[in-house]
């Protein structure tokens, strides 16, 4: 019995001769759903890198959902490329288990909405590969090294390439850090919502809340934000690579985002940030509170 069959149970793993075993993941798996969503939100980076690879980038591969009647299977394609309309073409990279309308090494074309993951190896390190990470996250820590050896990949938190805009919580964090790097106080404040930050802060205190109290607290937070930058300068995020391994939903408009920062000197820091979906888009409220 292979490693994955031992970890997940034999009925949940398809063992394939000469190829890595395939883990069967339930359709309602929250981690896998987020992995597929994350792959879609960062697909632009894969496409840009595929079009103009940087030194050290190789092994471009992309995962797609193949549908055969009532059956479906996520399969990796090698040698991927896109046409002018965004349709994907590639070579089936592993032997299908549940579908029979494609076969190993077959060249196929498929619509981009069926893309479920992508991966690049950058200087020996896995970038993307979110569905691989979702499976790995369920493995006991003592078995992770053996898993990495079996799939023959170096896997850490990676580097995520969300677009720096207010369309996602992660994009809002990157937008704020970009504003810091450009020393643009107005752009930084556009990534904030001091009223909501005040409401969130005060909600954890044993006191009566009203709009006037929240507004006064919001004004204090705003003044403190500006004063801190004037006295201490802008935080420096230049040369930092970011990963966002986890989202925690508080409610429909509040998410706590875990950010990993890889520093130029090789160091790593981790922070958890409270984000909020405001009328203008996602904004950054501040570090996670003790009750979140």
Outline where the language-model segments fall:
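Surface-exposed, charged secondary-structure patches
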Residues: 200-267
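OB/S1-fold single-stranded nucleic-acid-binding modules
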Residues: 8-57
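Short, low-complexity N-terminal intrinsically disordered segments enriched in polar/charged residues
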Residues: 156-185, 194-200
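Cys-His-centered catalytic/binding microenvironment captured across papain-like cysteine peptidases
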Residues: 39, 72, 81-85, 89-160
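Short beta-strand segments that buttress and anchor functional surface loops
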Residues: 63-67, 91-93, 255-264
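Short beta-strand edge/turn micro-motifs at domain boundaries
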Residues: 119, 254-292
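Short coil-to-beta-strand transition motifs
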Residues: 67-78
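Long, contiguous regulatory modules within eukaryotic nuclear regulatory proteins
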Residues: 57-67, 240-244, 256
């Amino acid at each position: 019995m292979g490693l994955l069959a031992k970890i997940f149970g034999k009925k949940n793993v398809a063992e394939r001769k000469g190829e890595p075993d395939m883990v069967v993941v339930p359709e309602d798996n929250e981690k896998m759903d987020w992995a597929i969503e994350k792959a879609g939100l960062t697909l632009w980076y894969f496409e840009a890198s595929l079009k103009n690879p940087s030194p050290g980038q190789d092994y471009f591969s992309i995962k797609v959902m193949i549908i055969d009647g009532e059956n479906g299977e996520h399969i990796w394609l090698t040698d991927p490329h896109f046409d002018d309309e965004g349709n994907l073409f590639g070579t089936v990279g592993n032997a299908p288990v549940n579908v029979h309308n494609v076969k190993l090494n077959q060249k196929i074309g498929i619509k981009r909405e069926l893309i479920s993951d992508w991966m690049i190896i950058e200087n020996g390190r896995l970038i993307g590969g979110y569905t691989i990470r979702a499976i790995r996250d369920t493995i006991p820590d003592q078995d992770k090294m053996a898993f990495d050896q079996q799939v023959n990949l170096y896997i850490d938190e990676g580097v995520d390439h969300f677009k720096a805009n207010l369309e996602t919580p992660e994009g809002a964090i990157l937008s704020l850090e970009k504003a810091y790097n450009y020393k643009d106080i107005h752009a930084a404040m556009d990534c904030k919502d001091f009223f909501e930050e005040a409401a969130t802060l005060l909600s954890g205190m044993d006191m009566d809340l009203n709009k006037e109290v929240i507004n006064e607290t919001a004004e204090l937070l705003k003044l403190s934000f500006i004063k801190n930058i004037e006295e201490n300068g802008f935080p420096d995020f230049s040369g930092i690579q970011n990963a966002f391994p986890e989202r925690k939903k508080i409610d429909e408009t509040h998410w706590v985002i875990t950010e990993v920062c890889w520093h130029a000197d090789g160091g790593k820091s981790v922070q958890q940030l409270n984000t909020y979906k405001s009328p203008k888009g996602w904004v950054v409220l501040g570090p996670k509170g003790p009750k979140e």
